[in-house]
Amino acid sequence: MNTETTQDTTEAKLPGERLREARERLGLTQQTIAERLCLKITTVRDIEDGTTPADLAPTFLRGYIRSYAKLVHLPEDNLLPIMDKQAVPKAISVSPMQSFSLKKSRKKRDGWLMIITWLVVLVVLGLTGAWWWQNHQAQQAEINSMVDHASSMQSQTEGQSVPLMDNSAPQETSTAGSAATPPSTPVDLSATIAATPSTPPSSTTASSAAPSSQSPSQANATQSQAAGNALLGAGAVAPAATVADSNPVSAAHALVMTFTADCWLEVTDVSGKKLFSGMQRNGSTLNLDGQSPYQLKIGAPAAVQIKFQGKPVDLSRFVRSSQVARLTLTAE
């Protein structure tokens, strides 16, 4: 009777308690057991306390207990069944099985995302096109208003009467005056001949060689004619010199425009005077000479080639943007 009670009490003890008692009977410490079994002292303590480490698999735990039992001379066949009875089964977490509907819903979500993306792209493209169309319409309206203004100004100019001057009477008076001037003004014949080297020497020699065959009135007429020719020669030389002097000034402000298509144009000089405002046809050339800097407005920059002071003017930036060209040309 006492033997059965002792066996039941022994079996009721946990494997860890039995291992601890056996270790104490042998006079061993936990550190000694850990060193002999090559375990951590915390693992030995958990085995004796009956605590299963969370990071330790049951298979390794059974192996550690078997080695511990052999070390303290306990039958391992009695410890392992007790451990299996008292072990608490772990709850196995089973992941829910994914159905095919999840993949289908993901595809559906991706489809909606693509639709929204394409809608955003289409809205951006539409806004860009609307912005470009508004700018194009504004430019066309501005060009049309400029053309209408130029046409109205041209019609007003054509409607005004321009008086015509009759230059025949002044020419006759001038001719008569020039003819009457030599007799009233004494002219030195020798000085006149010296001032006009273009007069042929033969005529002078012939006139001086035969003085006896001319009357005094004829001699006076000859002298008057020679003096008139000298004055006309001097008058012809003076304007030529004036034109030659004025050419550098004109070249410094010369503006030449050649048109390859119909184009509206407006040119204003530094004083605010409009040198030109209207349409120019294909193949025409416009030469302007005023006071720089010039203010230019060109409706179709691609249809005009500009030279200022003999140098071409670059209009490529206006041609690329298809805008009305507004630029200022300043003399160097």
Swiss-Prot record:
Designated name of the protein: Cytoskeleton protein RodZ
GO MF annotations in UniProt: DNA binding
Keyword entries, A-Z: Cell inner membrane, Cell membrane, Cell shape, DNA-binding, Membrane, Signal-anchor, Transmembrane, Transmembrane helix
GO biological processes: regulation of cell shape
The HTH cro/C1-type domain, residue ranges: 19-71
Listed transmembrane segments: 112-132
Recorded name of the encoding gene: rodZ
Highest taxon listed in the record's lineage: Bacteria
